[in-house]
Amino acid sequence: PQMMGIPLILIAIFLPTLLIYTSPTRLSTNRMTTLQLWLTNTITKQLFLPVNTPGHKWAAMLMTLMIXLLSMNLLGLLPYTFTPTTQLSMNMALAIPLWLATVLTGLRNQPTASLGHLLPEGTPTPLIPLLIIIETVSLFIRPLALGVRLTANLTAGHLLIQLISTAAFVLLPMMTLTALSTFIVLVLLTGLEIAVAMIQAYVFTLLLTLYL
């Protein structure tokens, strides 16, 4: 498949390389390297604001995860491509091990504080059993919420794009003006989906940092 004479397979192969930081071979950096450094530093600072210093060792892994999610989300908006992150199985395969790692790390390093989160301070005695059950359930629901949120947001956006593009294609021979207005809506929705793809990658990573 091609778009404006450009094979889409070339875009799918080379676009993610723009997000990967490569160490410059000389002292003066180019604009792309400067942009990569600025984005990496800005996002890392925002992600790790609520995390204490020992948790900063997760920075490299979580930034890699965010770039992987961002690449897959954006590449899924290209025609004739498939978005892996619209599959719940893949999102759960990412969410469950990372969530489990945060839980086990907390239990190993600060077992008392980790177990203390299951019972808020100042809880009335009659409510203690109920609150422990509620907090335990909410703890185990976290990976499901991560996976379902990412899947649902991307799937809903792709379905809307598919429906509106089909409507524009069907209306074109019958009502040209209506088809053109529908196409404008499609362009705006595509821009919104690009923003959603970026935001969802950021939110997925941000929630993992909050679980640390």
Curated annotation (Swiss-Prot):
Keyword line: ATP synthesis, CF(0), Hydrogen ion transport, Ion transport, Membrane, Mitochondrion, Mitochondrion inner membrane, Transmembrane, Transmembrane helix, Transport
Keyword Ion transport belongs to the record: yes
Membrane topology designation: Multi-pass membrane protein
Entry keyword tRNA processing: no
MF-aspect GO terms: proton channel activity; proton-transporting ATP synthase activity, rotational mechanism
Cited PANTHER family: ATP SYNTHASE SUBUNIT A
Protein name as catalogued: ATP synthase F(0) complex subunit a
Name of the gene this protein is made from: MT-ATP6
